[in-house]
Amino acid sequence: VFGVGQRTQDIYNADALSEILGKTVITRTFPEIVGREIRRIHQELVPFTQDERDVYQMAMKEFWKMRENYFSSTGNSRKDAMMRLIQQITLLLRISAAPDTVEEYQGSLPTKIRRVVDLAGRFENEIVAIGVRHKVVLDSYKAALEEAFPNRTVFAVTGGTTSFAQRRKLRKTLKESGNGILLCTQQSLPSSVNFEYVNRIIIPEMHYNNAGMSQFYMRFVRYTSTEKKDLYFPIYIGSLESNLMQMVLAKEKLTMFMKGQDADMDEIYAKFGVDYD
């Protein structure tokens, strides 16, 4: 049914597939239900510094030097060889999220973390939500945010360290803060707890598809929301993140088709604030 091409993910036998979906899939998108689109997506392109580029290139070209510091052996050489590429991709994405989380990094505060801090600073009188995927990345951002904003409360939330009851209580305490910063792993917010009063959402570490990320940011974008919601995606220029974003967009085209929306890639680029020219 599906074919993959450069910068595209085409759908073959679309008419037949559409007929099947029309009989089996019943779904409506958020804008269709609320009658308007309140999400505004912004790409924040971040250049590498030389120190950041050096550690990224080391992970690209000399992964064997770094591997044992972050991944344990299975004890089976064949399995280790099969896992090597996946581990390298994982490490490259970790460096793209927070270069200072690897011991080989020799620089100062990474540019992306500084950009996220600057974004949070733009909204000094508003509540800001920041979603990452891994605790080691969260710890790096937490240290930078607490140093930059000693007078703002940073609410750090992970599924492993914060109970469900505490996460439910967070809804009230975050709102009462007035300008607090919610820093969490994206999967840690329970689906039953919504933060519709938060309008600024920053995602410096992406999922492999928009469905995964939307489970996080839709905690803030609610059917009862009345204000625009700004979603920021800081991305290192020339990193694997750029490829990951392209994969997210290609998957989004398929998702939209499954929902009865046959959009082309230019429309999806516009939706996600991407300009590939």
Model-derived features: where do they sit?
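Inter-lobe coupling linker of SF2 helicases/translocases
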Residues: V1-Y105, P110-R114, D118-N125, L231, ...
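Short, solvent-exposed loop/turn segments at secondary-structure junctions
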Residues: I26, D51-R53, K61, I95-T101, ...
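Conserved phosphate-coordination/catalytic loops
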Residues: M83, Q106-R114, V132, T161-R168, ...
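Conserved RecA-like ASCE P-loop NTPase motor core of nucleic-acid helicases/translocases
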Residues: I127-H134
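Conserved helicase ATPase core of P-loop NTP-dependent helicases/translocases
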Residues: G131, D139, R152-Q186
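SF2 helicase motor core recognition
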Residues: L138-K142, R167-R168, G180-E205, N209-K228
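Short helix-loop-beta junction
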Residues: L145-R152
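A conserved SF2-helicase RecA2
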Residues: Y208-S214, V221-D277
